[in-house]
Amino acid sequence: MKKILLIAVCVMALVSCSNVQVMGFDKVDASEVIVTETYKLEAFEKIDVKGLANVKIIQSEEKNGVVELKAPDNYIELFKFDSKDGRLVIDLAKKVNLDAKNVLITVYTTDLIGLYNSGVSHVKMDSLDTDKMEVINSGVGDIEIGGVADDVKLVCSGVGCIRAKEMKALNVEANVSGVGSVTCYASEKIDGTVSGVGSLKYAGNPKVKNTRRTGIGGISEL
């Protein structure tokens, strides 16, 4: 058990680094010239992050479907944005290693019901007003989200975390099966499962508490 915990701690330490390198990919050094490119895409209500970047999401009617990329000028062509069938996919156009500390992708959308990270990214949304929301983190990185919602589903199966304590939800379904953690807020009902090495922490003093734990992870109330 001690060995498993040590592995988990080491992996989480690697996740905290802003410059994750993938073996076999060429390294592209960042230039010192920072530029901003703006893209107008089809409207979307789901966002899928697959690349390596810092992503900020803003709920906005005026700039709905707009994506802004601020990065070193030689990094601009390395990113691609595709919006189709209500889903925005953020990915790298080439298989390269880059330094993401000076890369910021700002996404504007009227509504958001799904947020997915399968890359190596930090994704943040401070204030979201929606009826339902699904957040899945299966990559290496973290998702931070706040706002209000009726029903929220949180799934962490990768190496990272979902921080949703500031997402004031009525009902939360949370599942942790990887090496990571989920923090959340539920005022009516929490349905939580931990089957990995990670942890689930919840606030809001929900009226109904259904929690299940297998493995060496933990579940606790904040």
Q: Residue ranges of each PLM-predicted region?
A:
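Intrinsically disordered, low-complexity terminal regions
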Residues: 1-157, 161-222
